[in-house]
Amino acid sequence: MRKPAFTPSAVLLALAPLLLIAGCSMAPTYERPDAPVAANWSGPAAQPGRAASNLDWQTFIVDSELRDLVNIALNNNRSLRQTLLDIEQARAQYRIQRSERVPGLSASANGNRQRLPGDLSSNGSSGVSSSYQVGLSLPEYELDLFGRVKSLTDAALEQYLATEDAARSAQIALIAEVSQAYLSYDGAQRRLLLTEQTLASREDSLALIAQRRSAGAATALDYQEALGLVEQSRAELESNARQKQQSLNALVLLLGTPDAASRIPLVPLDKPMLVQDIAPGTPSELIERRPDIRAAEHQLKARNADIGAARAAFFPRISLTGSFGTSSAEMSGLFDGGSRSWNFVPTLSLPIFDAGRNSANLDLAKVRKDSAVAAYEGTIQTAFREVADALAATDTLRREEIARRALANTTEETLKLAKARYEGGVDSHLRYLDAQRSNFINEAAYIETSTQRQIALVDLFRALGGGWDGKPVAQR
């Protein structure tokens, strides 16, 4: 008997050249756009410190209690948890798309028993027939001759990587928000204590004025001025208490646990800096390190791959299906000699007329890439603006903090002298009250400037990419 012209081995040999060229991509060669920013940072130079590229957040935050709070937030914050789930979703979508590049294989077994009436039977008599089949089947598999599937897989991979970098950016933002909320809470607590001390001092002064008034040594005007300062301190006390509670509430929300309020410690008033100075490094390092810039570039690469898929749609698509196994009219004969069976179905699809659909899809892919380029460049410009602002803030606030500390020390000495001169009858009560006001204002301003300087350092840390160490955000 003559052997069939097409056997499985012959088919594989015929398809070998096609399999070798399959996967050639038609996507444009990716080139990173030039950064639309200067080669160096504008504004003042940064203060000496650890380079951001070598500084993770555990090192940047020198206060152990603040580090503990950040860890709590990273493990419990709902917004971050949702972002991490988005990573898992993007990863699953990439795996689904990647699976289309590999032929599938499935096992099958089926049986069929039917009765044919005589008018449909070849011999003119009715009868019952049976058939059984066991084997392996190849689901529809596309030979990726022009890289359509590869381009779609590349786009899915870049989308997944963009999602992971977006989550890393959200993680850095959460670290910064917790740190700044804690610093605001610390500043509010310090201002509240200063106001309490000032109120107590002014109440003592009011009592002294009342005694001097009874003795005829002070006027009603002196008493009313002293009373006004007491009421002012009481109003300031309530304002600072409100700010402290609101800072605490913000911190509780960020931590994300029911018992968060009980886990926030009171900040010791003599505690030094909670975070440390950092050096920004070079602009080129920022492009490689900052997660939102990396995410924008991954989005750009995904749109570049989409162009390859859109171009491949103009060319023929070849898909394969088939099966190989044994068939028999009796179940007991499935594995007898000569029961082997196979089926091979190649399909060629060639676009002829689509009313301009493929051209429109290609135009859309190109426009989306141009949009991604603009978004990438805009992200870089925004990042450089944030770094420049943070550098300016840390530089000026550092000098301002020094000046305000010196001013507060001066007004404190002035207050001591004014009090002694007033009690000695050398100066008027009005000058003593002015010294009290000035001292309170300058002490409060120093506390606020000190707080804002540390908050600005956190802003700089976030703007520089948070000292990312390259570790995955989510468990892979």
Named regions from a protein language model:
Residues 70, 133-135, 182, 227, ...:
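Membrane-embedded beta-strand positions in outer-membrane beta-barrel channels/transporters
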Residues 149, 165-282, 393, 417, ...:
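Periplasmic alpha-helical coiled-coil/stalk elements that build and connect Gram-negative outer-membrane
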Residues 45-48, 52-61, 110-138, 261-279, ...:
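Small/polar, glycine/serine/threonine/aspartate-rich low-complexity segments that form flexible
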Residues 25, 66-68, 131-133, 180, ...:
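Transmembrane beta-barrel architecture of outer-membrane proteins
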